[in-house]
Amino acid sequence: MRFVIVTGLSGAGKTQAIRSLEDLGFFCVDNLPPTLIPKFAEACYQTEGKIKKIALVIDIRGGKFFDDLFESLKYLKEEGYKYEILFLDASDEVLIKRFKESRRKHPLSPDGRILNGISMERNRLREVKDRADNIINTSELATRELREAINEIYGEQDQIENQLVITVLSFGFKYGIPLDSDLVFDVRFLPNPYYIKELKQYSGKDKKVSDYVMSFDVTNKFVNRLEDMLDFLIPNYFKEGKRQLIISIGCTGGRHRSVAIANAIYEGLKSKGHEVNIDHRDINEDIHKGGKKL
């Protein structure tokens, strides 16, 4: 089990750090009183491997409970529980700027100067920082860069590469464009099986319909160009911090062309090792005569 304790200065980026760890599959708890760490650790270790990665945020908000941190860490060590400390730091100037921009009060100086609170906090956290396994100074890091730093330390390579979850979604324009779409492609320019008597009753999931749609040169050119564009977009979306991508492909009713094309794109992405799901939102709507969808 990997047990990470996240701490550091207020305003240094602990919230973003815990979100990044959560994206990496860590079970995360924010602001757990240090006195509860031993019992929490015991409970997690007793799950028999169901919980493999844990991250706790411990900070000055814990008040007097924070003083119990070292006793809890001593207990963990004596009981053989391995843990790591991640310390988030930043310069006084940057912290002051962040507090002013957020209009938040410093927890150790709610009615006084921000700098005084920062100084008090630095003194209280000095020993924790000295014990830290990893220290990240966020003074000059953008959110994306902090996420990358977290990934480099705590992420597994195959997990990082497949962290963007892709959903390929077919739909019918007559029922509305899916509201959560990131990319929308209109395939109503392709030959329509709906007007072929022996194909109308089937869907794009059926081989005879799929073969018909994919038999045209225009279809193959479109699929190839779309795949090339996705090969370019996906790593750049990931680089900018996107963790979910919804690719919506629409035709008139969402039963024939969009389904066949969505399946082709899904198979192509899957063959390249992406974590990808497929959903045909309106495949049965022409049968049920449903209304507008989200």
Curated annotation (Swiss-Prot):
InterPro entries named among the record's database cross-references: P-loop_NTPase, RapZ-like, RapZ-like_N, RapZ_C
Top-level taxon of the source organism: Bacteria
Binding site for GTP: D59, I60, R61, G62
Pfam families referenced in this protein's UniProt entry, alphabetically: PapZ_C (PF22740), RapZ-like_N (PF03668)
Residues bound to ATP: G8, L9, S10, G11, A12, G13, K14, T15
Signal peptide: none
Keyword field contains Transmembrane helix: no
Residue spans crossing the bilayer: none
Keywords: ATP-binding, GTP-binding, Nucleotide-binding
Gene3D superfamilies from the UniProt entry: P-loop containing nucleotide triphosphate hydrolases
Function: Displays ATPase and GTPase activities.
The name this protein goes by in its record: Nucleotide-binding protein CLK_2809
